[in-house]
Amino acid sequence: MKLDPLQLIEYEIALLVRLTTAHSPRLGSLDRSEYLILCELDENGPLAINVLAEKLMLNISTASRQVGALETKKYIHRYPDPNNGRISLMEITQEGQDILIKVQKARYGVYKEILQEWSEEELKQLENNLTRLNRDFKKWGN
């Protein structure tokens, strides 16, 4: 039986998630949630927990738990918002930036090795399609 393209896409995405999870130790010492939170804070911080949760499409309790774990590891610092003392802001620490850079280099190396036989055109096409797919998923989830 021939599967339609959407069935194949769904399967390939599920397989990709499984493969990246199975090989996550080679992708660095941060789990996916830690990595995404540190990336967001590095790019856009400092942020309040509700803003961070919204950007990463997490509920507040999940985001709070993950932020707490990163705070324990000293990868982020939480402090009162100077404009509203009832709100805490979070920013990435130097230790957080150091581990993020280390993990980004490891991840880059893995993807460079995996995609070494792809042409620049194929890489650009993959980049465009993944960016579009993520954007459409975010739109759909709102």
Give residue ranges: language-model regions:
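Hydrophobic alpha-helical segments typical of transmembrane helices
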Residues: 5, 37, 110-111
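Exposed, interaction-prone assembly regions rather than primary DNA-binding/catalytic cores
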Residues: 124-142
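N-terminal leader segment of winged-helix/HTH proteins
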Residues: 1-32
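Charged, amphipathic alpha-helical coiled-coil/dimerization segments
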Residues: 69-125
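N-terminal helix-turn-helix DNA-binding core of bacterial DNA-binding proteins
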Residues: 21-62, 72-73, 89
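Residues within the DNA-recognition helix of helix-turn-helix
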Residues: 66-69, 129
